[in-house]
Amino acid sequence: MNRRMKIARIGAARLSAALLLAALPGLPVFAGVQMAHAASTEPDQPADMLVPPTSASDFTAAQLDSVLAGSWRAEANRARDVYRHPKATLQFFGVRPDQTVVEITPGGGWYSEILAPLLHDNGHYIAAVAASSRDGEARRDDSALHRKFAADAAHYGNARIVEFDPKAPVFGAPASADRVLTFRNVHNWVMADTAPAMFKAFFAVLRPGGVLGVVDHRADDAASLDTVKQSGYLPTRYVVKLATEAGFTLDESSEINANPKDTKNYPKGVWTLPPTLTLGEQDRAKYIAIGESDRMTLRFVKPAAQAGETH
């Protein structure tokens, strides 16, 4: 095959891939058209350099890469990617740019910096925060989140913040969300005795077939809830119990956020480790070497509606 024919085939392949993407759910037509135009006008490249995305999952991965590299992300937050594995975690939860995603108690907005821009154009990001009667630290986090969103409309302008009552939570209209995500929060609800109500509210706001994604500090399998809950760690089986009693099915668990260096036995519980480092300079190097906590990563599904059921 001569060089001209090879280039023509490459261009045709790229054009086909771009038009395929244009037909994918959640990808606006103009994006596919722009990609098609680029495919027909870009200068010659070696064939092995051309790796056009050919599926919705490829497109989501490319979008995640772009967002994770975003200049709007705080440097301190970016430094924690090595512990929190945001790309792999969000892919495991099946997050796509065209979905409605509710993040429960986002704190200062570590994941907000990723999710809000990812969902800005074709989806909806909703940050659910507890009503403002809470303690000072929680109020400061929520105020910081409001300021973050207000200061950068280009990335957060379509994000919403909704308040809920932890004792009787409602996160939105029934069956209105594709994903509910929560990161390192369940232990707080267990200590406050609000966890069952929270999981029931997650179930209510999700569409049938929707996913609940949970990440939290993982206790040893043999640990009892009573002995560890004040440490910030939870037995995985207890979190599964909370979810299944609310109506969810455990779809899959992952070791994405595992840390085998975490012994889970510290003077100040999980808060002894980074990023909190409650002990300050005491044994700081030791705890930094351990890294952030060992975490369960659980994907639950709200069962699809059965024939004859209404929602």
At which residue positions do the language-model features occur?
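Helix-to-beta-strand junctions that scaffold the AdoMet/dcAdoMet cofactor pocket
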Residues: L119-H120, W189-M191, L206-R207
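A short, conserved alpha-helix within the catalytic core of class I
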Residues: P166, N188-A201
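A short glycine-rich, Lys/Arg-flanked "PGG" loop and its adjoining helix->strand segment in the class I
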Residues: A116, A195-P208
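Conserved beta-strand signature within the Rossmann-like core of class I S-adenosyl-L-methionine
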Residues: G209-H217
